[in-house]
Regions:
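Terminal substrate-recognition subdomain of acyl/acetyltransferases
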Residues: 1-37, 159-236
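Short helix-terminating capping/connector loops at secondary-structure junctions
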Residues: 71, 123-125, 162-168
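Conserved acetyl-CoA-binding loop-helix of GNAT-fold acetyltransferases
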Residues: 131-136, 141-159
Length: 236
């Protein structure tokens, strides 16, 4: 027992030393897939939000965890193997057509969003996706964490489409910081408008396909969507 406690203390000290000196071990990350998250992870996500986002645009963990309980595909995260804590995540919400229009108009905040505005992936169908948050802890923003997480999101979208016929027609998101705008550009999203609350709305269309992606997972995703569009063209 004493040996276990000593090892735990050493690991905790080592983790704090790495973070204090901003020494991030190369690629020591693992993806936390949607079904593997717990409430404590959402508290950690909230703490990351407070470091990088505007306070008035942050949804508390009680709200985000309720989204996750309603549809556990709403969140995908990445964790440090060293600290065993989430260090970044995507919030990707399948939303109603009405909410999509509200977000597109520029008059909406995440903490106003309830499960009434969300959809479950319970039937094969076409869905609109709201990327409510893309966050990486500041200490990990110059590592491979974002690319690992981004590719995991694309992999999840491929699997939803090919295995369950869950197709995303439109993606929309809101950038409130310079880092958020950077992420939107990396994601290949186009700016749609500037809002009156000093944010920018970005978006992309998958059906008909216009989203430009460069990664191997992105190329695979859009190849599949282009084939599906040709198959279902009469619906659009």
């Amino acid at each position: 027992k004493l040996a276990e406690l000593s090892m735990t203390a050493i690991l905790e000290w080592y983790s704090k030393y790495l973070l204090h000196n901003k020494i991030i071990p190369h690629d020591k990350f693992e993806i936390v897939w949607p079904e593997d998250l717990n409430y404590n992870d959402f508290v950690t996500m909230y703490e990351i939000d407070q470091l990088v986002l505007r306070e008035d645009l942050i949804a508390p963990p009680q709200i985000t965890y309720a989204w996750y309980q309603y549809n556990n595909y709403t969140h995908i995260a990445i964790r440090s193997i060293v600290t065993q804590k989430v260090i970044g995540y995507f919030t990707v919400l399948p939303i109603t057509d009405q909410l999509y229009e509200d977000i597109q108009s520029g008059y909406f905040k995440d903490n106003d969003l309830s499960t009434d505005n969300l959809r479950k992936y319970d039937i094969p169908d076409f869905y609109k996706l709201y990327i409510a948050c893309v966050c990486i802890h500041p200490n990990y923003q110059n590592t491979s964490a974002f690319n690992r997480l981004y590719n995991a999101l694309l992999k999840m979208m491929i699997e939803l489409a090919t295995e369950r016929e869950i197709y995303v027609t439109n993606i929309i998101t809101e950038a409130s910081t310079i880092q958020g705008e950077k992420f939107c550009k990396i994601l290949g999203l186009k700016r749609l408008l500037n809002t009156k609350i000093n944010t920018k709305i970005y978006g992309a269309t998958l059906l008909p396909p216009s989203w430009q992606l460069r990664s191997s997972f992105g190329t695979k995703l859009m190849k599949y969507y282009k084939e599906k569009y040709e198959e279902l063209r009469e619906l659009f």
